[in-house]
Amino acid sequence: AQEEEAEQNLSELSGPWRTVYIGSTNPEKIQENGPFRTYFRELVFDDEKGTVDFYFSVKRDGKWKNVHVKATKQDDGTYVADYEGQNVFKIVSLSRTHLVAHNINVDKHGQTTELTELFVKLNVEDEDLEKFWKLTEDKGIDKKNVVNFLENEDHPHPE
């Protein structure tokens, strides 16, 4: 069922998305000022081109920076993107209201970090949370290495 969900017309899911949770095998990557402590604003899916554009904010050296990353779909259904190294991004579960994803990042030092991510369009459903926590557990990420972005006080303000 998960693969069928991911095969739907993704372009219609383009629009505002927000970060709820991100888990990481390398906690430094999601700590304050970390490169993957990302606050998503928008996702733009292009089925024809096989791309997804990520628009998010990240805090670097105490200042908010708006970032745009384009990922390209591969034959195996994953997406690859350059951001803080090489990334292979897989959509694990997707609906009109949630996106649960797994990202493998290899940074410029050759360090591999696995990240689990939950993004939502509206309110977080219990079922969406269950999918995220199951993936996080399956990937061996400890709950203490997960950041809740909705409850975090320090976040970018809309422009």
Curated annotation (Swiss-Prot):
Subcellular location per the Swiss-Prot or TrEMBL entry: Secreted
UniProt xrefs under InterPro entries: Calycin (IPR012674), Lipocalin (IPR002345), Lipocalin_CS (IPR022272), Lipocln_cytosolic_FA-bd_dom (IPR000566), OBP-like (IPR002448)
GO process annotations (BP): sensory perception of smell
Predominant subcellular localization, coarse grouping: secreted
Keywords, alphabetical: Olfaction, Secreted, Sensory transduction, Transport
GO MF term (any one): small molecule binding
GO cellular component: extracellular space
Record-linked PANTHER family: LIPOCALIN (PTHR11430), ODORANT-BINDING PROTEIN 1A-RELATED (PTHR11430:SF65)
Role: This protein binds a wide variety of chemical odorants.
Subunit structure: Homodimer.
Family to which this protein belongs: Belongs to the calycin superfamily. Lipocalin family.
Name of the featured protein: Odorant-binding protein
Organism whose genome encodes this protein: Bos taurus (Bovine)
